[in-house]
Amino acid sequence: MRLRLSARIAAALAAITAVGLAACSTAAPSAPSASAADTTIPLLTVGLNNTEDGAPQTLDVTKAIGADYITVLGLETLMRFNAQGKVEPDLATSVTEPNPVTYVYHLRHGVRFWDGDPLTATDVAFSLNYDRANGSQVAFAYPSVKSITASGPYTVTVTLTHPDASWPYTPAEINSQIFEKKFYEAHKSTYGQAGTLVMGTGPWKIDSFDPTTGAELSANPHWWGGKVPIQRIKMTSFASATSEALAFRAGEIDLAPDVYTPLSFASTSGAKLLATPSCDIDIFIMHVTTAPWNDVHVRRAVAYALDRSAIMTAHGGYATPLYTLIPPQLMQNIASKSQIGSLLSSLPLYQYNLAKAKQELAESAYPHGFSASILEINDPTSLNEDQVIVAELQKIGIRLQIKAVTAADWTAVESGPASQRVSSETSASCFNPDPSAYYDLLGSANTAVGSWNVADYAPPAVDTLMADGLATSNPAQRFSTYSKLLGNLQTNIPDVGLYLSDATVALSTKFSAPGYSYWTSPFSSTGQPDFYLDLRPAK
């Protein structure tokens, strides 16, 4: 169905309040939710679909960010997100801000690693510095950090190079998991690998890991948060969504936390999916420093030619159209719904319009079309969506060839030298509810090897706006800056927003998941174990 512009804006605004996004808080309960702790689940079997991100070869998230589905259960963070997206203490009990560039985290006493050693500030500082080191796949989360030091046995001081309104979220993200320094130093060359594993403080101890078959975990009897409800977790890797769905139907797995093709998975598995709106995006990225993508009229033609409804159908439903790189709901903390609506009304949103697409292409250096290649991960969902994109663009004379590669090869290219990155349709996750959540896709800093500015879009004006957006916590000033940034992005359109995907999981009817939300979902990139802690046997 084709929607008028005003209807699309209304749909975008309706999504603003769907994901519970909220400002930071430093007061919190003493422990993560463990409402299922009065009941015991002997074994939970979990499926992992490796077709989208590829099977992680290590549990070291600096080398394999996709390992977070496993490590989130064992490696904790200083802070955490609650179900409403507010930041609360976790391994830290509180945080103080003596000045705009200094954050002092006061650690929880009595926390021990699985080997019995106490958690200290030295472990925390070492972990965070390791995560932010050059070449780390999660280093993008630390652009404003000057230093992280153990300023006392139980205090960690983070000093920023400049004020950063997004920093308070970072210690709650999967990009900031804490592990034991002593264990790492004893196993530097093999840390995270199958024979070595990792050493954490979390509710489940990782007992075994195999990149091909999966992982096994057991309840940590000494967890500081109390009794752990699930005694054992067995994670099994699957080579396809179909094989995972069939295993669910056969009762071989209880939980599929990573349902990428919701409609087909539900049909094959027989599962009634749990779904909640998210701020995870799917976008078509154009590498703006190579022809023909360096022609803005080509990029605008592509934006007009893509039929989001058809692409969402290929995805498998459970999605909402997206027209900007920054999802509108991420600005809820800095602007009112009416302000966001007025901003969207002022921007070119590139609603599906083949006539305008052809007009833009006629104004380009390629009025009769062109041939080009795009890079894609070789999994059914992505390829189905790409086939729709190919068919849509062919209508205006753009002939695309899909080059399908493994997830590892895709990552090597798209986070490799910026000049060699390739246009691609891909998905991305928001690690926090700040409008800067997708900065890793923009700016000169993220053209470095290991970073994710696939479009290689880094004009000085964008760098300046990105910096200005973080330099103050004043909502009005931030909204003004992000309005200008969105204006730049919508005018130059390096990335075409396609849709926001719901966070969908399949859960056996043997269990219930009260309070299911994006911020505590096992599908989420925020890195919380709460979904597992809150699981209950069905009544």
Predicted regions and their residues:
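N-terminal lobe/hinge region of extracytoplasmic solute-binding protein
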Residues: 47-98, 129, 199-200
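Extracytoplasmic/peripheral linker and loop segments enriched in polar/acidic and small residues
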Residues: 96, 350, 401-409, 439-509, ...
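Surface-exposed binding/hinge segments that line
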Residues: 96-98, 102-104, 140-185, 208
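Periplasmic-binding protein-like
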Residues: 170, 289, 293-334, 384-385, ...
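Gly/Pro-rich hinge or "lid" segments in bacterial periplasmic/extracellular proteins
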Residues: 173-227, 232
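Ligand-site clamp/hinge motif
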Residues: 220-266, 399
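Structural transition elements
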Residues: 319-360, 381-384
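Long beta-strand-rich cores associated with HINT superfamily self-processing modules
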Residues: 505-539
